[in-house]
Amino acid sequence: MSFFDSVKLDLVGRLFGIRNRGLAVTCCAVAVASIIAFPYIRRDYQTFLSGGPSYAPQNIRGYLIVCVLALFRQEQKGLAIYDRLPEKRRWLPDLPPRDGPRPITTSHIIQRQRNQAPDLKFALEELKATVIPRVQARHTDLTHLSLSKFEFHAEAIFLLPSVPIDDPKNVPSHDTVRRTKREIAHMHDYHDYTLHLALAAQDGKEVVSKGWGQRHPLAGPGVPGPPTEWTFIYAPRNEEELAVVEMIIEASIGYMTNDPAGKTIA
């Protein structure tokens, strides 16, 4: 260490009342790292706020929560994971590939879409507060509407409390249903019009492989988050894409309610 470095450390020690030279070095390193990292942290915090309302409060406390949870982030687009899951039935037909590249999504575990937004007129007339209620209305014997357990500002489709899930013979997706607290699907129609929903493994594989969505960043085995089947669906941009998205919601309801229309695949 040079004479000048030694003098600097002595000054830092005197300034903060630190007598231990090693502690002074550590404090200097932390201070320099904080100064360097501050612009990134500030941008990252703004990105977190831009994601809109979610389960994490939109303040420093919420930001710290998502930063800690990000330590458990999982890969979101691989397909091999689906073949390891026991459910082999499908409720979706073969889907057409989604037009264009995948949208850019947020780097945070609060999953949002950052580009390819639907036209505002289409969103307000065809998506906002209409998609989830419209699909649920076809399944009132097994489902009901309530606020999401994951996104406290979103209306969600739930399996009725009267439907038993303790016996695997009644609902083969019983573990998934339990982990989502009976929630089947919700749309972020207060923000970017994306959705989260639970899909049977082979339906999830179809959705991800055709570019219609990806898994939740905390969805995976051994992770303290939603089940592997919890899937993020990109916002529909037109009537054709909306029709596909509604089919995906229908498939989610079919899986979570054990609709016998599910087809076993080889």
Swiss-Prot record:
Compartment list: Membrane
Enzyme nomenclature, EC number: 1.-.-.-
Superkingdom, natural source: Eukaryota
Catalytic EC class: oxidoreductase
InterPro entries, alphabetized: Luciferase, Luciferase_dom
Entry keyword Isomerase: no
Secretion signal span: none
Residues annotated as transmembrane: 22-41
GO molecular function: oxidoreductase activity
An annotated GO cellular component: membrane
Biotechnology: The availability of a complete eukaryotic luciferin biosynthesis pathway provides several applications in biomedicine and bioengineering.
Entry keywords, A to Z: Membrane, Oxidoreductase, Transmembrane, Transmembrane helix
Function of the molecule: Luciferase; part of the gene cluster that mediates the fungal bioluminescence cycle. Uses the fungal luciferin 3-hydroxyhispidin as a substrate to produce an endoperoxide as a high-energy intermediate with decomposition that yields oxyluciferin (also known as caffeoylpyruvate) and light emission. The fungal bioluminescence cycle begins with the hispidin synthetase that catalyzes the formation of hispidin which is further hydroxylated by the hispidin-3-hydroxylase, yielding the fungal luciferin 3-hydroxyhispidin.
Homology family: Belongs to the fungal luciferase family.
Protein name, entry field: Luciferase
Classification lineage: Eukaryota, Fungi, Dikarya, Basidiomycota, Agaricomycotina
